[in-house]
């Protein structure tokens, strides 16, 4: 599995700000979008371009355009919605596919409850967004669903990943690509990433 920990100074700085314990909902939400935007920049670096002639201000001009890439952004509800706009900043024409999965707090197992996928998803590159890759269960279940529907080009974008989640994802889906702003130390006994960000969903939506 291709694993990219994006170590750009802007990414490191913004993620560091997100680790503040008393960060406001507004600030956390803004930073989640900004870091997702920077991860998207990295995740799309292998997109091919082609020469296209357009009408410029002084006659025809040849420019580079991305070659035939249909993209769907796949936020995992609910926290993934906090990263979606960061992707759409760069790919505004992307279709949105929504997958609802929550983690049982006792078993830590993923429980699917909703999905609405883009049409012709088998022809698209899926960019799955979720702030945290902890146990990996929700991400694996989401990718299982995408592959069942014929989507086999999948990139995963997360703010923070735990080694345990990376290992589980790689075992289940070695063909996907993972882009993360940080690989943290470990999971605690409650399945939270340490040092992590806390509950990203609560911080994005202002709930507890």
Swiss-Prot record:
Binds 1 Mg(2+) ion per subunit. The magnesium is bound as Mg-PRPP. InterPro entries: PRibTrfase_dom (IPR000836), PRTase-like (IPR029057), Upp_B (IPR034332), UPRTase/APRTase (IPR050054), Ura_phspho_trans (IPR005765). One of its GO terms (biological process) is UMP salvage. Pathway: Pyrimidine metabolism; UMP biosynthesis via salvage pathway; UMP from uracil: step 1/1. Allosterically activated by GTP. Catalyzes the conversion of uracil and 5-phospho-alpha-D-ribose 1-diphosphate (PRPP) to UMP and diphosphate. NCBIfam families: PRK00129.1, upp. Belongs to the UPRTase family. This is Uracil phosphoribosyltransferase. The gene is upp.
């Amino acid at each position: 599995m291709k694993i990219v920990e994006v170590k750009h100074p802007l990414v490191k700085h913004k993620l560091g700000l997100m680790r503040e314990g008393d960060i406001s909902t507004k600030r956390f939400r803004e930073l989640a979008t900004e870091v997702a935007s920077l991860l998207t920049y990295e995740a799309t670096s292998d997109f091919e371009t082609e020469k296209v002639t357009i009408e410029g201000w002084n006659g025809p001009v040849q420019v580079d355009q991305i070659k035939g890439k249909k993209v769907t952004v796949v936020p995992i509800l609910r926290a993934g919605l906090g990263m979606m706009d960061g992707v759409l900043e760069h790919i505004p024409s992307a279709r949105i596919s929504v997958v609802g999965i929550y983690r049982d707090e006792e078993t830590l197992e993923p429980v699917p409850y909703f999905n609405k996928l883009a049409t012709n998803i088998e022809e698209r590159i899926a960019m799955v967004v979720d702030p945290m890759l902890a146990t990996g269960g929700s991400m694996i279940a989401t990718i299982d669903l995408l592959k069942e529907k014929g989507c086999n080009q999948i990139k995963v974008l997360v703010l923070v990943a735990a080694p345990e989640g990376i290992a589980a994802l790689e075992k289940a889906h070695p063909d996907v690509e993972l882009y993360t702003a940080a690989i943290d130390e470990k999971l605690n006994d409650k399945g939270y990433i340490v040092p992590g960000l806390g509950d990203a969903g609560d911080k994005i939506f202002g709930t507890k």
